[in-house]
């Protein structure tokens, strides 16, 4: 819990910007899964994850993007997952609702 308010704000802003971009790109109908955005829930995810250690494991529900990113999940892997690519965090099989990052200790 060493982050400044400014750092926490920028983490929340990053998540919001990612979510807004996903919402924009989803209309192109190239993403292979329904998406469940976390817009409006960024502060909860960032606040909780601020108090966790790298070794802590968390699970989230179907609106997992914010928690995944706040816990340190890889953005490129998450986006690849939404597009159903084998390079996705669940090898393109989990979609938006089933994100996984073992290195970050995250499951949804």
Language-model regions: role of each:
Residues 20-24, 30-108:
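Cofactor-binding active-site loop characterized by glycine-rich and histidine/acidic residues
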Residues 1-8:
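Charged, compositionally biased N-terminal leader segments and the immediate start
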Residues 6, 19-20:
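A broad, low-specificity signal for short, low-complexity segments enriched in glycine/proline
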Residues 3, 26-27:
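Short hydrophobic/aromatic segments of transmembrane alpha-helices and their interfaces
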């Amino acid at each position: 819990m060493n982050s400044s308010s400014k750092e926490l704000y920028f983490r929340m802003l990053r998540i919001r910007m990612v979510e807004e971009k996903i919402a924009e790109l989803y209309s192109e109908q190239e993403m292979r899964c329904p998406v469940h955005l976390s817009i409006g829930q960024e502060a909860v995810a960032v606040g909780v994850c601020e108090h966790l250690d790298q070794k802590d494991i968390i699970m989230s529900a179907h609106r997992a993007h914010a928690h995944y990113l706040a816990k340190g999940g890889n953005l490129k892997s998450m986006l690849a997952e939404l597009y159903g690519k084998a390079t996705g965090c669940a090898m393109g099989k989990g979609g938006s609702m089933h994100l996984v990052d073992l290195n970050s200790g995250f499951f949804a």
